[in-house]
Amino acid sequence: MNEEHRMERPGMQETRKIQKTGGSTYVVSLPKKWIQTSGLKKGDQVALSVTGDGTLTVDPHIPRASERLVKVIEVTHATDSKTLLRQLVGSYVTGWDVIEIRGKGRITPELRRTIQDFSRRVIGPEVVEESSNLVVLQDVADHADLDMRKVVRRMHLMSKNMLEESVRAVMDLDRGMAEGVISRDDEVDRLHWFVEKQHAMIRRNISFAAKMKTTWLESDSMLLASKAIERIADHATRIARSVGMLGDSRVDGDTMKALEQLGGEASSIMDRSVEALFKRDSTLANDCIERTAVLREKADAFLDETMKRRGRVAVGLAFVIESIERTGGYSSDIAEIAINLAEGQ
C-alpha cells in the first residue's frame, strides 16, 4: 500500500521500525498522510507525551502553558436566565478554560445574577473581569491537586451518606434529616460537572492526561462511574422527598425492618462496586452484580406486598423501594465499568 494512503481513518494502526542514528539517538518516521493532514512541515515541532499506560502519543499541536481555550457566549436583552445557564454549564463541562459572556448592549442584572450563581455552583470558574457589557469567567482550579479520582471518591462518600440518611429519615419520619439530604444533591451535581470538565480537558489535550497521571480509558471509566453515582444521589433525594408523602403515618415495625435491610444492602453493594472500580477487581465486581440481582428480587417482592396497602403510605413506600432498587442497578453499572477497566488495562 502506498504510504500516502495509509492512516486515513482514526484508529488505524501501522508498524514502524526504530532506526538508530549516531551513538544514542533513536528515530521513528511519521506517516506522510498524517503530516499533511496535521498541516506540518519540515522543521515544525510536535509534542511527545507518555500516558499512564506507557503509550507514547504524538500531538501536532504543542500546548503552551499560557494558552487558554476561550469560549464566547453572546447575550441580548431577549436572552433568558435558563438559556444562559444551560450555555454556561455546557461550556464548563466541555472543558473551556475561559468563558466570556458578551452583551449586545448592557448585560441585564438578571443575567449577571445567573452568571454569579453559576460561578458559585461550580468548581474553578471565577469572575476575573467585568464591565457593562462583558463578564469573563476563568478557571482557577488546581486540576492536578483535585483530580477526577479524588472527586469520584468524594462523590461516593456523599451519595452513600445521602442514601443511608434518606432511608433513616423515612423510618423516623424525620423531615429535618430529609431536608439535609435534599440540600446536598446540588453538591454532588457540582462534583459530577467537574469530572465531566476534566474528562473533556483530557480529550482535548492528551498532555493533560499525562499531567493528571491517567489514561483515556481510566478517564472514560471515571466519567461513567461519576454519572452513576450522581444518579444514586438523585434517588437518595427522591427517597428523602417521600417523607413528605408519608406525612405523620406510622408504618409497622416489620415493614420498617425490611426497608432498613433493603437500604443497607443497597449501600453495601454501592460500597463494594466503587471498591472494585478503584482496585480494578473483576471478581469483586462480579460479586456486586450477582448481589444486585438478589436485591432486585427482594425489592420486587417487597413492592408487591406494599401495593396491597392503600393510601399515601403505600405510594410513599413504593417510591422508596423503587429508588433503592434503582440504586442497586446503578451500583451494578459501576461494577460493570470496573470489569471493563480491569480487562482493558
Model-found features: residue ranges?
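Iron-sulfur (Fe-S) cluster-binding modules
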Residues: 1
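Cytosolic, long alpha-helical scaffolding segments
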Residues: 4-18, 23-25, 29-345
